[in-house]
Amino acid sequence: MDPRNSLQENAIFQFEQLTYNASYHTEEAVKNFLEGTFMNSSQNAPETSMKFYHIFWSIGAEENRQVSPFHLAARVLQEQGEGTSPLISGTYPGYEHYYNYFNVGASGSTNEEVIRNGLNYAKDHDWHGAYYSILGGAEVISASYIRKGQDTLYLQKFNVSPTASN
């Protein structure tokens, strides 16, 4: 596999480094990134007094995590689209106040099974509210990929690192 074959406008971002960089991962940049999405700055994230952009920026910048807030936000947008999934509603019967923005553990053969498995994961990990769901998802991404040397989407998809296990 020659990565030079992917140096095209629609594929280049798979080589972006996913670790935090204070010089361009600013809170204002994350705010601008989220404009026009269901996570824009017009309202607080569910069950918190914080805006989504502040959550992504502050969680990504934490020293032990060091994850690009752009990557976290883009991953949520990829998983949640318009933001209408029961996995992030906080109102699903039996799972009130639990959220799973990254769809971690959300698998199954029916929509109902996918939702329940994802919300079971959120409940088991105490992801109550948007903040704790994003914090938990960021930790999964950091521990499972980035801290194991897979800090680009390319390296996550094509594991070429002998120290990584994914």
Regions found by a protein language model. Name each.
Residues S85-Y92:
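Short, solvent-exposed loop/turn and secondary-structure capping segments
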Residues S23, E27, A45-Y53, R65, ...:
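Solvent-exposed, acidic/flexible segments
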Residues L7, L18, L34, L72, ...:
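Generic detector of leucine side chains in alpha-helical contexts
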